[in-house]
Amino acid sequence: MSGGTPYIGSKISLISKAEIRYEGILYTIDTENSTVALAKVRSFGTEDRPTDRPIPPRDEVFEYIIFRGSDIKDLTVCEPPKPQCSLPQDPAIVQSSLGSSSASSFQSVSSYGPFGRMPTYSQFSTSPLVGQQFGAVGSSLTSFGAETTSSTSLPPSSTVGSSFTQEARTLKTQLSQGRSTSPLDSLRKSPTIEQAVQTASASHAPSAAPVGRRSPVLSRPLPSSSQKTGESSEQRKGELHKTQRPDTEQLRNDNRHDPNKRQPASSAPQPRRGRGGNRGGRGRFGVRRDGPMKFEKDFDFESANAQFNKEEIDREFHNKLKLKDDKPEKPVNGEDKTDSGVDTQNSEGNAEEDDVLAGGVCYYDKTKSFFDNISCDDNRDRRQTWSEERRINAETFGLPLRSNRGRGGFRGRGGGMGFRGGRGRGERRGPPGGGGFGSSRGYRGGSRGGRGGREFAEYEYRKDNKVAA
């Protein structure tokens, strides 16, 4: 496109939608990205045009500025391209360069076509904007400096235009990938400027060129990409910091942070350590590798039943039903078995049935009593203690729901914390004038004992009834 454009090298006056006028030399027009590149650009400000943000003119001369075509309001040609300085068509000439005297004035496209390389990252140490915006580009960018330290070739204008278009595309691609910082609020920005490299004068060396102003149009989508870049840089710093930990943590995290110690994917995996290894071990036990069980023939029930001896099973069952203690029987339910002849007759009449059921021991006789003798405790040698009765009641009826009172009552009934309180009634039955600390502790024990007594009052009532009976 640039080879067939007759305006390449012309002096262009451009007015942006922000009413700011720029003058520079048309370098290239990119139809794909809709951008226009000007060299040796100077900003004349708004020049009394109606705008909400008037901007004064500036004396700085920018090496080049790339404008977005959609933000250009007006574009006029001030001067046609100047004639090229003619060199003799001598095949012996391979390379040539112009002196610094011709750098101030624009001679031809070929005079500024051979660009010098952009200064390296270390030369842009004055501004953080340059460090991230132009430092990452490095030597891939080209500047419009006329003073070149090394001799360069003189390509035709079409070749120069196409090369600058590629550089502009590369610059926009790198900017879209987040190689720019957040917008600087201290600088006035124009919405049409995409990139600007500022210089004090045209004859100044390109290595000392600072960075000019940038456009807020590009700065709008940049914070998200720059934020991603900041996060990735923080992750890289974190990985670098983790690799410099002490040896103990390196041995524990070497597979995670140190890429030099990672095994190739084709090699056999090493045994895992820590909790991950335990999880892996549990996972291996749950896998059945032998497949489902296969049966060759049906189950033979007849041979399995022949292995059982029914007589031995019946004998073992009857032995379990017999009582272990063969002590002489005591009066059951307040009656003696040998008291009346009716009892003897009933026992003789039911002898065969009792022998069949439990080996001659009678556990229930409806003529004597309504209750059976299986769970009777009257034939014991001694009375059961309070703790045994409490345990039996708990097994029979369950534990009370009011656990707090039960726990306090147990402490009170056993004396609890009341040393002088006796059976939990230290305040009433303790020694009079026991004084201060002892009486207070006795009172505490007594209070808890009182609650506990109310909790198990029903159990004591049953026991008293049994004794009375």
From Swiss-Prot:
Entry PTM: Phosphorylated.
Protein's cellular compartments: Cytoplasm, P-body; Cytoplasm, Stress granule
PROSITE patterns assigned: DFDF, FFD, SM, TFG
One GO term describing the cellular component: cytoplasm
Gene3D superfamilies: 2.30.30.100
Highest taxon of source: Eukaryota
Domain DFDF: 287-323
Positions of the Sm domain: 1-81
Principal subcellular localisation of the protein: cytoplasm
Domain description: The RGG repeats are required for interaction with ddx6/Xp54 and accumulation in ribonucleoprotein complexes.
UniProt family annotation: Belongs to the LSM14 family.
Name recorded for this polypeptide: Protein LSM14 homolog A
Annotated source species: Xenopus tropicalis (Western clawed frog)
